[in-house]
């Protein structure tokens, strides 16, 4: 499972860079764990070059050319890919059980499903494996004769799975009579801060979008002992904000320069992020923190980004190999739809009843002020598995 978490986190950073190429000046928010899980469902049905490309993009491939990989990374990838598909799927099953464990101090609702044109029936073995490893049931539907109705049914199901927070995943005209197969993935997250902000301290302050433009935001504030880390080579300060019970943390990376985000995005890798956010890199400070309230609801058709990363055959009618999924030829993936919902407010990552715990013993720590008033990166991490559940860039209120 540790190897899978590393793969998901590596995919997170690579995918973030790919999205950033076509999203200059715009917010980004997605779930690498969610996307990886959804694509792994598809991967289980592939063979040949289609499977190889997916494994490489998802970072669990023993690719032929390891020359650019350090020895430890070669060994990890070889070990992870040396077994059968079932071993990888089993790791996803174990990871999901940990992340979605009943009794967790947060709410995470997911909607993962494959919809295939009914003239391409699924193998029974594939259906059984999907239920075993992912608790999922691929749906055979009539895109040819009822694509509009199918779109409504998909949106209704996703809405019900996400507590009504994501009601319209598929936009108009996103599926039609030529659609062969679509993959949908949506996530809704609600968490409560370990130390909540007081609503009475929230005031309007400027958020500097760039050197010449500011926008007013509702800026939360609190003074609390928090863990801070410095990235000297990139002139960036990092902050860890725990959620209740410390199951999850929000890791925030703020460049010192207003226009420093692009340099940070270019330089960041999974290995660097793992090093920066390790316990021995963090120091405890008495922090006067100013953090904007914000809401992000981002939708992506992932086809373009995934093709750009090298996952091309899966979208090609002449090249896609889904022979582990169906006996019919010419089945290919039409689209991948991903949508996430996030709200950062005084109580946490979406308004929820509850009270934040107070520190009972004050740590004698140096004081600093951290004003998050210009573009930054953030990650929501599951601490036990070190898996990045969500990855985001906030640069425009």
UniProtKB/Swiss-Prot annotation:
Which PROSITE patterns does this UniProt record tie to the protein? SERPIN
**Which family is annotated?**
Belongs to the serpin family. Ov-serpin subfamily.
Q: Indicate what this protein is called per its UniProt record.
A: Serpin B10
The subcellular localization recorded is: Nucleus; Cytoplasm
Q: Which InterPro entries match?
A: Serpin_CS (IPR023795), Serpin_dom (IPR023796), Serpin_fam (IPR000215), Serpin_sf (IPR036186), Serpin_sf_1 (IPR042178), Serpin_sf_2 (IPR042185)
What's in the GO CC field?
A: cytoplasm; extracellular space; nucleus
Q: Which PANTHER family match?
A: SERINE PROTEASE INHIBITOR, SERPIN (PTHR11461), SERPIN B10 (PTHR11461:SF175)
The gene name on file is Serpinb10
């Amino acid at each position: 499972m540790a190897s899978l978490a590393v793969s998901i986190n590596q995919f997170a950073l690579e995918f973030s860079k790919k999205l950033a190429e076509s999203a200059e000046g715009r917010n980004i928010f997605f779930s690498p764990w969610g996307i990886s899980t959804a694509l792994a469902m598809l991967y289980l049905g592939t063979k040949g070059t289609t499977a190889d490309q997916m494994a490489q993009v998802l970072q669990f491939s023993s690719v032929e050319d390891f020359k650019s990989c350090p020895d430890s990374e070669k060994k990890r990838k070889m070990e992870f890919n040396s077994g059968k598909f079932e071993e990888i799927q089993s790791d996803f099953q174990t990871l999901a059980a940990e992340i979605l464990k009943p009794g967790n101090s947060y709410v995470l609702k997911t909607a993962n499903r494959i919809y295939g044109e009914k003239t391409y029936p699924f193998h029974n073995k594939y259906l059984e494996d999907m239920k075993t490893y992912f608790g999922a049931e691929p749906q055979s539907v009539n895109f040819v004769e009822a694509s509009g109705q199918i779109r409504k049914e998909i949106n209704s199901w996703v809405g019900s799975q996400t507590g009504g927070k994501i009601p319209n995943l598929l936009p108009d005209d996103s599926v039609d009579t030529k659609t062969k197969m679509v993959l949908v993935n949506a996530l809704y997250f609600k968490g409560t801060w370990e130390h909540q902000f007081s609503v009475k301290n929230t005031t309007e302050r400027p958020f500097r979008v760039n050197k010449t433009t500011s926008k007013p935001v509702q800026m939360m504030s609190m003074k609390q002992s928090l863990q801070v880390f410095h990235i000297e080579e990139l002139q960036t300060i990092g902050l860890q904000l725990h959620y209740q019970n410390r199951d999850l943390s929000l890791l925030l990376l703020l460049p010192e320069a207003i226009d420093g985000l692009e340099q940070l995005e270019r330089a960041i890798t999974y290995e660097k992020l793992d090093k920066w956010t390790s316990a021995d890199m963090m120091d405890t400070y008495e922090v006067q923190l100013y953090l904007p309230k914000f809401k992000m609801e981002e939708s992506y058709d992932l086809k373009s980004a995934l093709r750009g990363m090298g996952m091309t055959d899966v979208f090609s009618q002449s090249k896609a190999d889904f022979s582990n999924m169906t006996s019919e030829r010419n089945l290919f993936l039409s689209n991948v739809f991903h949508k996430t919902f996030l709200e950062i407010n005084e109580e946490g990552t979406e308004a929820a009843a509850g009270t934040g715990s107070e520190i009972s013993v004050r740590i004698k720590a140096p004081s600093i002020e951290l004003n998050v008033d210009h573009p930054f990166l953030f990650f929501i991490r599951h601490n036990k598995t070190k898996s990045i559940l969500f990855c985001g860039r906030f640069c425009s209120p």
